[in-house]
């Protein structure tokens, strides 16, 4: 469940931006012969619907119906009492409420065209019960998987999304800078990071830690207290207006000087070669995450990713890498923008 501020800013996400995104989607729908596109959303898979409407659910689930010739309609399992909140925080032609979102969406579409051609982004990931309700609500509707249609459109970041990612990254930088330093417990550091991120307007923030990099470099959620090693890593995952980024830093327990400049330069050099993985040769491990359809930070490629997904030009991603400098373990990460063809990729902000 979302615990931070969910609001809409027309200065940061103007109607013209949503209009341009919808126009691109509708052009692809027209070429594919689709009458409508369906996108599923919940509090963990919000990045498809929020990209087209600004809507981010704090809980529950919904289906966005994007007709080829009309404005989008949201069919939400949330109760009617939050209707005005949904309308304030998003741009939608209509909000329909009902517990069976598949049935309601299909009935609405079938009422206008009984044999409409419907594309569903990430059909394989849609719950079987919702698919069954779609078929019950519109027995003559033609349902097909529209993942290949939607994914390339969603992957390419426009200037508005890049600006939101920069804002999220600035929140993460400021939050990580609040780590108390020598003598502070891990719990105190995490609390300070969360408090600052929420004060700065984060929609959501999650903090993960690797308490002792000499023993284990895996990041995890900390329950209770954990003893700190000579160096430890903290990762802030921040959401702002539907855009998610990760920022990871390594900290010395005793406040000793770290090779920050050399470490940041090595990460930036590896990122510059994306979408090729060549820059990460020699790293202990690495990971690139980003949005394909609805999950905001899905694993796209990395040393432990079995099936890699090609990075689209102008894609926003978050990169994390594990390596050593002068014998010291370092875990670093930052958001990045993949270049267009022939251009180098670049970090949006440095990790330190």
Question: Across the structure, where does each feature detected by a protein language model lie?
Answer:
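Active-site neighborhoods and metal-handling regions in enzymes and metal-associated proteins
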Residues: 1-352
